[in-house]
Amino acid sequence: MTPRRCLIAAGGTGGHMFPARAAAEALIARGWQVRLVTDARGLRHATDFPAVAVDEIHAASPSTKNPLKLARAALELTQGFAQARSIVGKWKPDVIAGFGGYPAFPALAVARSMGIAFAIHEQNAVLGRVNRVFAAKAGFVASGFERLDRLPAKAKKRHILTGNPLRAPILAARDAGYPAIDADGRLNILVLGGSLGARILSETVPQALAMVPEKLRSRLDVVQQTREESLPMARETYQAAGIAAQCEPFFEDVGSLYAASHLVIGRAGASTVSEVAGVGRPAIFCPLAIAADDHQSANVDGLVQAVACDVVHEGEFTAQKIAALIETRLSNPDDLASRAQSARALGRPDAADALARAVDGLVTGALV
């Protein structure tokens, strides 16, 4: 029997590519062949992507008022459409699955124009611009969170909650459980700033931890994703405060870092929020203020309602406020453990399998 084929189209950031990778692995486990189309940025996240082929296509965002940039974006997307049409014509996928981002636009446009079954997965709690264009005609709209704003009325009957597919190391951290906190034992803090590290976290969190009372400060072990230009200052701040800290722009083994952590501090991107819930960790989130449709604030809605996290918006994210909040949380291990349990209850470790089942069902007519 010839394996079914799924063409995955995903944008060029880790937020789009990591769920696409996990979904690809689940589809392959079900006997599918997978092929990926993305742009030049996406290729940075496509090393060892589980696919029979990885294709680079042209793509650009038309979200600009500059006429020259708008014309260039239109040209890039037109070229991308031609490239995607050629790939689809030769490979003949059974399904095209879009994971958001403008590199997904050409492939989804080809699917719609050629009558090929297609589906979309939205990582955030607000439907993104590209997914919004295709949602009404998609075979299904899968979402990472129960909340999904900006979903067209025509697509609501085909909305399914799968969760955001998580990488295997993250799922392994879930199995590790929440680490016990012994009296006077070490307290592990993990600070994540998205794929490039957030400036406000890189600069404010070290200052905040340096203000924590010495009795707690002496117990801290900090692992922080830090912007390259902020590394010297962050390291100097931690060293002056006597805090054991490891600061790097990127960490390869994030799963083990999650497993060891007692508290996570980070942005509220879909991947980070889903990982925090998937592993089951209390967290302090600082949503990106300029995120489209304020989707990062929407992403944490479920965890907020479950009393599993704190949310501090950028305008209030000062060293003094964060220091006081961290002191409050770390001084109450029972509350931390309770928050971890509440977060874990919202995790969806089977998200990749659920999405793969939905793709299967789209082809067989048994969508569940």
Swiss-Prot record:
Keyword Protein biosynthesis in annotation: no
Pathway annotation from the record: Cell wall biogenesis; peptidoglycan biosynthesis
Subcellular compartments: Cell inner membrane
Keyword Lipoprotein: no
One Gene Ontology biological process: cell division
One GO cellular component term noted in the UniProt record for this chain: plasma membrane
Binding site for UDP-N-acetyl-alpha-D-glucosamine: T13, G14, G15, N124, R167, S195, Q296
GO MF annotation list: UDP-N-acetyl-D-glucosamine:N-acetylmuramoyl-L-alanyl-D-glutamyl-meso-2,6-diaminopimelyl-D-alanyl-D-alanine-diphosphoundecaprenol 4-beta-N-acetylglucosaminlytransferase activity; undecaprenyldiphospho-muramoylpentapeptide beta-N-acetylglucosaminyltransferase activity
Known function: Cell wall formation. Catalyzes the transfer of a GlcNAc subunit on undecaprenyl-pyrophosphoryl-MurNAc-pentapeptide (lipid intermediate I) to form undecaprenyl-pyrophosphoryl-MurNAc-(pentapeptide)GlcNAc (lipid intermediate II).
Family: Belongs to the glycosyltransferase 28 family. MurG subfamily.
HAMAP family reported for this sequence: MurG
Protein name (Swiss-Prot/TrEMBL): UDP-N-acetylglucosamine--N-acetylmuramyl-(pentapeptide) pyrophosphoryl-undecaprenol N-acetylglucosamine transferase
Protein species of origin: Maricaulis maris (strain MCS10) (Caulobacter maris)
Higher taxonomy: Bacteria, Pseudomonadati, Pseudomonadota, Alphaproteobacteria, Maricaulales
